[in-house]
């Protein structure tokens, strides 16, 4: 949710993009797909009994959580203008629109039956909205020839003064899936399918973007236009045609299984801090990914491309990274198992020269600062670069700007930017001016184990292993590919992945509603027994369904080892009561399987949280191991503690206290731990956000708050753990801890240190517990040392991280520490472990990585556009 620096160069690129979105219409091409029929669907979501309520809404039983757009007058006949009806379906019920910023009390699940829905203005997706099409017969949303607006679906509208409805990096809890969005009725000179300016707990899934094919530079159509935000996850998307399949800019993001066909440029990366692409497929495009924005002064922090294939596309990746580019670690690029046999050049400079030729599979290629035991002897080095110190980044700044106030026009009130020349406009076809690429080894960086400030050795974990020294090299080279354990790989040799289940072929009568079984979900009634009864009686062919509501749980729910559970737009499971009050004897709210179990567990579309203080609660204890690969997992399940209605942990009770020496109020304690993946378990996690709230979502002040939550995610599994698009924020002792584990794959992770630390520090109010191998901070001598670890890896093997953003923005809500990038001392601990960490970005931590009590990787030698970034950390030889 952080923000960074404003760049006029980025602004110029955004202005040109927006001009394209609002260009006048011209000749209309014919559609490029078959129009779906409008018959009734057998998809369960369209016919299941609707009993969901918004328990903290205050509007009573009349508030509708589920909305079918046809109930609001939409025709879906391919000719009627359905704009007003669709927007009414979304907005009705005094929901969170312009001027609201955020609210959890007005959720809406908006369903599109099969059909073709013509729109002439943007569909505005209000906060806490899921737009869901029929999964069996995907509906089409088609832009009329007269369409005017920023995009067919707009997640964060702009006003004429350039302001947004929602704060981009706090634009949480929204999703779109199962749609075809069609721009082929527009002239090729304008149009975007989705304006996706979002933050955590957001997703796009199973969407096809239809745009005009060909047209050269005159084609300005875009599938996804993303200007900024703090995401996020998207998966299973297909982009056909257009200029840019996707125009991306965000702090951090994870994408999986994106396919681009016949785009001028598949992906234009405008800016980021960290972005992971898994399973890209690019076919018949001009450029697969252009990350060269900014030229010499790079705007892209880091990109990971994994298990991907580029076919019949001349240019794979266009980069501006070279011997002279700044910042030093800007433009970090990792290629891991990427098939460029269909490309002339795999990696190309902005000026057009080939860096890596195409025609083969690149097993492993690294661009950026590598810290390894073998860097000095094996890596092709580039010299380090020195740049002027940038302006101090502030929390209330943003690294990718909104467009400037637009000029008045005859179009609806969406921004049409004033014309203006940007500093530099990236092109899809770089010029032929050669770039200087060094041919010899040039010394860069340092070798050793001690930066300016030593870090303490952990006393809650193993200390016998000596700290292996690492050497820094600024590289642009192929490296040996680390061997990944077979347990993590699918049959084709790629890292395993699995889409969120939608149960398309399950009939509605196979869903067991917890409300029909007696649970109330009203945020007042103890629903423990009713929920347990439903779980106990569910059979293998049934799915337990949580209608939207707030379900109070007062003792441990035992989740069987073979079960499927899904919810209606994130129903809340809330731990409360005396059973969860003892932090010295914590118990789980949801105990998923028993130690030693093997089975098939699927959890999706849920919120797990507390009502009031629950310092003796582990929200989810995950014990079950997979029976078949990936058969146990969580998709779109979010851990959200405090900061919203019904939690009793809000800004009116737990406001921040930076001006006094703080003794934590027991009424503002959260949970003992959010997620524990135990020793015998395995798990597949996708789009899972573990968030201890830093600010209020529902009360009008949206003020910052102090919620004290002991620990984030503890992973001890010796099975397989996959984590795609996960984040863990604002936990007191640590956000992620991996100990005595193996076979852990993370792509990507994001963390934030609690804003209130070090008032109090990490040792308050949750004392380190030896049973859980907590950090003790016993050797710390400064306040900056006693802050939450972003990630600890202890006594573990085969741990892979492809992309990480681990941030520290405050010292007791003040930001003077950003001037020296020293808000805390240490962020990542690696001890007695075999790890491969790629694309790691940290903010304002003096030491990025420590081991055995010594700082190995200092942030000051790895400056990027906003964070400090390294391409690779590995303590062994490559």
Swiss-Prot record:
It is found in: Secreted. SUPFAM superfamilies: Pectin lyase-like (SSF51126). The keyword Hydrolase applies. Its EC number is 3.2.1.39. One of its GO terms (molecular function) is glucan endo-1,3-beta-D-glucosidase activity. GO terms for cellular component: extracellular region. Glycans are attached at residues 228, 257, 290, 297, 505, 659, 795, 862. It catalyses: Hydrolysis of (1->3)-beta-D-glucosidic linkages in (1->3)-beta-D-glucans. Residues 400-416 have a biased composition (Pro residues). Residues 1-27 form the signal peptide. The keyword Ribosomal protein does not apply. Keywords: Glycoprotein, Glycosidase, Hydrolase, Secreted, Signal. It comes from the Eukaryota. Residues 373-472 are annotated as: Disordered. Its main location: secreted. Belongs to the glycosyl hydrolase 55 family. This is Probable glucan endo-1,3-beta-glucosidase ARB_02077.
């Amino acid at each position: 949710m952080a923000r960074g620096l404003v760049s006029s160069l980025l602004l110029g690129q955004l202005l040109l993009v927006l001009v394209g979105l609002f260009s006048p219409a011209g000749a209309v091409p014919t559609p490029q797909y078959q129009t779906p029929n409008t018959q009734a669907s057998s998809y369960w979501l369209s016919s299941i009994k609707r009993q969901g309520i918004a328990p903290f809404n205050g509007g009573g039983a009349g508030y509708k959580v589920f909305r079918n757009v046809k109930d609001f007058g939409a025709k879906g006949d391919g000719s009627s203008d359905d704009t007003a009806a669709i927007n009414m379906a979304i907005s009705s019920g005094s929901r969170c629109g312009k001027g609201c910023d955020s609210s959890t009390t007005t959720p809406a699940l908006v369903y599109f039956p099969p059909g073709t829905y013509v729109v002439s203005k943007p569909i505005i997706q209000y906060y806490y909205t899921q737009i869901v099409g029929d999964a069996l017969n995907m509906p089409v949303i088609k832009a009329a020839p007269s369409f005017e607006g920023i995009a067919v679906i707009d997640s964060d509208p702009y006003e004429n003064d350039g302001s947004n409805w929602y704060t981009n990096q706090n634009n949480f809890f929204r999703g779109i899936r199962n749609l075809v969005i069609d721009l082929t009725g527009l002239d090729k000179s304008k149009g975007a399918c989705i304006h996706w300016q979002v933050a955590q707990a957001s997703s796009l899934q199973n969407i096809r973007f239809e745009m005009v094919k060909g047209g050269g530079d005159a084609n300005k159509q875009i599938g996804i236009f993303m200007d900024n935000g703090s995401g996020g996850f998207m998966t299973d998307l297909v982009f056909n045609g257009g200029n840019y399949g996707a125009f991306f800019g965000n702090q951090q993001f994870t994408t999986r299984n994106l396919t681009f066909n016949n785009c001028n440029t598949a992906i234009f990366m405008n800016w980021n801090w960290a972005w992971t692409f898994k399973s890209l497929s690019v076919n018949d495009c001009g450029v697969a990914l252009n990350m060269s924005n900014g030229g010499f002064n790079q705007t892209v922090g880091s990109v990971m491309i994994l298990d991907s294939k580029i076919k019949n596309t001349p240019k794979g990746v266009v980069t501006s990274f070279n011997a002279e580019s700044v910042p030093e670690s800007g433009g970090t690029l990792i290629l891991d198992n990427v098939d460029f046999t269909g490309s002339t050049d795999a990696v190309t400079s902005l000026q057009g020269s080939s860096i890596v030729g195409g025609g083969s599979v690149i097993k492993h290629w690294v661009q950026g600062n590598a810290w390894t035991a073998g860097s000095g002897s094996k890596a092709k080095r580039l010299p380090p670069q020195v740049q002027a110190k940038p302006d101090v980044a502030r929390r209330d700044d943003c690294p990718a700007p909104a467009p400037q106030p637009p000029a008045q026009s005859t179009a609806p009130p969406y921004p049409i930017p004033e014309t203006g020349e940007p500093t530099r406009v990236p092109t899809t076809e770089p010029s032929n001016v050669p770039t200087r690429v060094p041919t010899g080894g040039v010394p860069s960086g340092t070798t050793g184990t001690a930066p300016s400030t030593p870090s303490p050795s952990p006393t809650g974990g193993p200390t016998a292993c000596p700290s292996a020294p690492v050497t820094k090299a600024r590289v642009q080279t192929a490296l040996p590919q680390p061997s990944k354990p077979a347990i993590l790989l699918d049959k084709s040799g790629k890292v395993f992945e699995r889409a969120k289940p939608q149960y398309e072929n399950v009939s509605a009568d196979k869903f067991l509603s917890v409300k029909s079984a007696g649970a109330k979900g009203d945020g007042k009634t103890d629903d423990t027994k009713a929920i347990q009864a439903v779980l106990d009686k569910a059979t293998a062919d049934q799915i337990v369904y949580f209608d939207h509501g707030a379900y109070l749980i007062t003792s441990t729910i035992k989740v069987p080892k073979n079960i499927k559970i899904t919810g209606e737009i994130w129903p809340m499971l809330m731990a409360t009561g005396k059973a969860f009050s003892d932090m010295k004897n914590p118990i789980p709210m949801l105990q998923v399987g028993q130690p030693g179990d093997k089975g098939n567990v699927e959890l999706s579309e849920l919120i797990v949280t507390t009502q009031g203080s629950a310092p003796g609660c582990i929200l989810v204890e995950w014990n079950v191991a997979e029976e078949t690969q990936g058969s146990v997992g969580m998709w779109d399940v979010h851990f959200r503690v405090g900061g919203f209605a019904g939690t009793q942990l809000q800004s009116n009770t737990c406001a921040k206290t930076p001006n006094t020496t703080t003794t934590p109020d027991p009424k503002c304690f959260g949970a003992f731990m959010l997620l524990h993946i135990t020793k015998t378990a395995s798990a597949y996690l996708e789009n899972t956000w573990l968030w201890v709230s830093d600010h209020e979502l529902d009360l009008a002040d949206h003020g910052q708050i102090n919620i004290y939550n002991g620990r984030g995610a503890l992973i001890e599994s010796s099975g397989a753990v996959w984590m795609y698009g996960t984040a863990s924020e604002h936990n007191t002792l640590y956000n992620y801890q991996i100990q005595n584990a193996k076979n852990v794959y993370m792509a990507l992770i994001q963390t934030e240190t609690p804003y209130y630390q070090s008032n109090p520090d990490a040792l308050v109010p949750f004392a380190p517990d030896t049973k859980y191998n907590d950090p003790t901070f016993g050797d710390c001598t400064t306040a900056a040392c006693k802050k939450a670890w972003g990630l600890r890896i202890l006594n573990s093997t085969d741990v892979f991280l492809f992309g990480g953003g681990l941030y520290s923005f405050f010292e007791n809500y003040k930001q003077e520490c950003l001037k020296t990038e020293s808000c805390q001392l240490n962020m990542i601990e690696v001890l007695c472990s075999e790890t491969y960490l790629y694309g790691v970005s940290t903010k304002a931590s003096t030491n990025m990585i420590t081991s055995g009590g010594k700082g190995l990787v200092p942030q000051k030698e790895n400056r990027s556009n906003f964070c400090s970034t390294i391409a690779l950390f590995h303590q062994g030889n490559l």
